[in-house]
């Protein structure tokens, strides 16, 4: 694993030594997969869901080198065909030892879908893509899963932002996937998602195909004390120290959200100054100001009612009863019906979400910017 100049990783997964805690969740997911259980992983964005998946897969690869682990993020897919093409590119050819015989076998197996082989520029590993016409969608998906089944290899597949399949225009996508997945004797899945209400409905509603098909894990925040020990250990490599109260100030400033903590720690480590609450405030303000152009564009894209509601939620930080007369009157908001309509739009656009019973601004830095610039608007 590469040695990093800054141990506080903001993007991607860089290995176990740079990964904080999650021992309990890692063990739970690994045991589920190893005991033939699919698992659902639910958390808001920026809590560390994707990093945890890669951490689990790294641990599995060390313990079970013959097991194949695949990760695909389907957030950008808009229909079943795009899902199938991404799945094909992710898995086809990756469970075979590279040889001319294996490549011919794959080409023959997927002959009806015009398979094309290319080589990854970074790794040199062959990658296959297939062409799927609308009439071939169901058959092509069946072929991919049959290919995995016939490999007789143990396979774990993580599908991130899995709730996206509910947005596809094709009818019956969930039922189609479920019908194939349940009969795979050697393939087990992590279904991960950031939209809690959609994921919960998909897996806990008796009317949905994936009902009671998987173990559920709602990802909690990283424990403050564990995070403190991790942060202080790495700060010590640069002769920096941070007392527990100072770290707790940072942790609570961003509600324990992993990505924001990492972003601030990364900058504190870079600066190399004495770590105080004042330094944390300075670094946080710097990070917020760096994104001001984006925040102005977000705000300007809203209607007056949406902007007023977003600002009101930012001022209160967390709102339990958003349609209450007290909240509406304190912030001079329009009628409850207008607030309800604005709320729906803000949720759909992922400006806000409901967490532990309260509505919160999704982007913590955007919330800070709103409190600073839009108070009373």
Language-model features: where?
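A short, basic N-terminal segment
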Residues: 1-39, 44, 59-65, 353, ...
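C-terminal leucine-rich, beta-strand-based interaction scaffolds used for sensing/assembly
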Residues: 2-8, 293-377
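P-loop NTPase nucleotide-binding core
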Residues: 42-47, 51-156, 337
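Alpha-helical DNA-recognition elements
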Residues: 59, 176, 267, 345
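Conserved Walker B catalytic segment
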Residues: 127-195, 204
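Helix-loop-helix "sensor" segment of P-loop NTPases
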Residues: 201-252, 274-275
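Conserved C-terminal helix/linker of AAA+ ATPases
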Residues: 247-248, 270-291
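C-terminal helical "lid" of AAA+/P-loop NTPase domains
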Residues: 247-253, 259-273, 308-311, 344
């Amino acid at each position: 694993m590469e040695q990093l100049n800054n141990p506080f990783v903001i993007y991607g997964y860089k290995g176990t030594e740079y990964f904080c805690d999650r021992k309990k969740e890692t063990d739970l997911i690994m045991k589920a997969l190893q005991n033939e259980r699919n698992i659902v992983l639910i958390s808001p964005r920026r809590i560390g869901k994707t990093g945890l998946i890669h951490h689990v897969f790294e641990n599995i690869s060390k313990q079970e080198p013959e097991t194949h682990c695949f990760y695909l993020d389907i957030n950008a897919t808009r229909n079943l065909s795009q899902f199938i093409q991404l799945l094909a590119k992710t898995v086809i050819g990756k469970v075979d030892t590279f040889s001319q015989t294996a490549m011919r076998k794959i080409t023959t197996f997927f002959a009806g879908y015009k398979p094309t082989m290319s080589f990854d520029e970074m790794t040199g590993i062959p990658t296959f893509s297939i062409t799927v016409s609308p009439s071939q969608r169901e058959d092509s998906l069946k072929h991919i899963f049959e290919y995995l089944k016939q490999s007789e290899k143990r396979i774990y597949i993580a599908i991130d932002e899995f709730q996206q399949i509910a947005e596809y225009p094709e009818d019956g996508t969930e039922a189609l996937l479920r019908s194939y997945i349940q009969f795979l004797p050697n393939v087990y899945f992590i279904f991960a998602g950031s939209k809690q209400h959609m994921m919960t409905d998909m897996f806990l509603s008796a009317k949905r195909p994936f009902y009671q098909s998987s173990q559920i894990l709602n990802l909690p925040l990283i424990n403050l004390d564990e995070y403190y020990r991790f942060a202080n250990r790495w700060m010590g490599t640069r002769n920096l120290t941070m007392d527990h109260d100072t770290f707790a100030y940072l942790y609570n400033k961003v509600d324990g959200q992993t990505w924001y903590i990492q972003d601030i720690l990364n900058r504190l480590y870079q600066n190399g100054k004495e770590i105080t609450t004042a330094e944390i405030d300075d670094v946080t303000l710097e990070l917020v100001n760096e994104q001001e152009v984006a925040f102005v564009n977000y705000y300007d894209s809203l209607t007056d009612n949406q902007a007023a509601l977003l600002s009101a939620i930012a001022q209160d930080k967390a709102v339990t009863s958003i349609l209450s007369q007290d909240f509406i009157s304190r912030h001079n908001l329009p009628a409850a019906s207008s607030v309800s309509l604005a709320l729906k739009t803000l949720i759909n656009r992922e400006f806000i979400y409901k967490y532990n019973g309260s509505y919160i601004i999704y982007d913590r830095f955007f919330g800070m910017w709103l409190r600073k610039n839009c108070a009373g608007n």
